[in-house]
Amino acid sequence: MDSFIFALSAVAPIVLAVVVGYFFKKIGMMDEDFAKKANKLVFRAFMPVMLFVKIYDMKLSDVDFGFIGYCLIALFIIFGLSIPACLLIAGKKDRVGVLVQAIFRSGYSLIGIPLAGSLYGDEGMMAATILSAALIPCFNVLAVISLSALGNDSGEKVSPVKIVLDIIKNPLIIGIFAALFCVAVRTLVLEPAGITFKLSNITPLFQVLQYLANLAIPLALLVLGAQFEFSAVAALKKEIIFGTLTRTVIVPALVLGVAFLFFRERFSAAQFATLVAAFATPVAVPSVPMVQEMGGDVTLAGQLVVWSTLVSAITVFLVTFLLRMGGAF
């Protein structure tokens, strides 16, 4: 019973926030135009600031390179295995890259990081934020590769220069690396010189950053709910089922199963919470505009976000319940 309550308490707030966003849309409080503008605010301002604030507080000694290595190896294996599978499943050329992206690219920044906090408090949130410095850039690089190299119906080729520029200009990556730069300066320059300075010393500035950071998660979840569009797309049924089940069932079963069987004593509870956040969450919302920009099947991309989010409400609960029963938390 304790494991059931633990899992429900971790997952329910996130699911309910998304439901509230959908309800606001239905009663006219959040229309499509508002949702688009709010989404831009979240990903261009609030989320980068949140990542900056969380990473800024960490110490270099907090970084577990072994754990990060496991996550990156798992990500690249998933990416590699998904390509031949999607080539077999996808009915059209412009669906292959969309499916591949859906399988490896979880909603880590939007749903995963707050989920890690729900699962294991500030320690879980910190572990997830530290991993984001490595995982989010890799998500973006692999997404661009999958959508360009695996083909699209537009026939356009994306130049390597554009790929690099898009990655560098990504607001989340800017927030992450700005924080890492500050941590490095503080640890390697200021502290050895006997200077103890943090942004919290400048109270007005730090409070403004905290205000913006605190807006990121609740607004992002409300917007996610407001952007839900349910539609039956018979022609995409095979791809939707395959992409949704692979993203929400097969990937977490493999990554978390291996971690539990072979690294249970090695990984902490906060790190298991981070694994759930990184590999059990639904398809990333930003995958849709990226597909649209690069000539993929936008309808499929949108439906994969919707259906994987719905299914993950159940699968994340079950994963959390099983890990709690097994003593990972």
Go through each PLM region and give its residues:
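Alpha-helical transmembrane segments of multi-pass small-molecule/ion transporters
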Residues: 1-329
